[in-house]
Regions:
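Extracellular ligand-binding/catalytic regions of CAZymes and related secreted enzymes
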Residues: 59-62, 71-138
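Extracellular/periplasmic catalytic domains that process cell-envelope and extracellular macromolecules
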Residues: 19, 44-46, 68-77
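An acidic, glycine-rich "communication" segment
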Residues: 1-59, 118-138
């Protein structure tokens, strides 16, 4: 659904994370919210992909999440994919709407049902207090 192209431009800052396809299962259970992340400015997304998420960077709309559903055809079982350029900062994963978007995308991609209210992504205070880097290997 998307292609990596070097030197696409980069912007780090805050922007509302907007649902371009609110009816898509990835968008269930969360609404637009302010997100601080690193945004790639000119992503290359396939014509068949569905833009799902957008931010505004440097005053311009930027697609930061897209979905692709490959149709079933003779000899091919089809399949789903979700791509995003988000997720550069640990603090975003501490936010429930961000986690819900990611887990919804995983469920949808795996062909699982996404609940109407979105995936359950509740964490305890202890979970949220975990350090942002993995523990040293023994």
């Amino acid at each position: 659904g998307g292609t990596w192209v070097s030197n696409v431009g980069l912007h780090t800052g805050k922007s509302p994370l907007v649902q371009l396809a609110p009816e898509h299962p990835i968008c269930r259970g969360w609404t637009e919210y302010e997100l601080f992340d690193e945004y790639y400015l000119h992503p290359t997304i396939g014509d068949e992909a569905t833009p799902v998420l957008e931010v505004t960077a440097n005053g311009e709309p930027v697609i930061v999440g897209w979905a692709y559903e490959r149709p079933m055809s003779e000899g091919f079982a089809g399949g789903r994919a979700f791509g995003t350029t988000l997720g550069h900062f640990y603090k975003n994963f501490q936010r429930e709407p961000f986690r819900r978007m990611v887990v919804n995308a995983i469920l949808w991609t795996a062909g699982r049902d996404v609940p109407a209210g979105g995936a359950d992504v509740a964490l305890s205070e202890a979970d949220l207090a975990l350090p942002p880097k993995p523990a040293e290997a023994n």
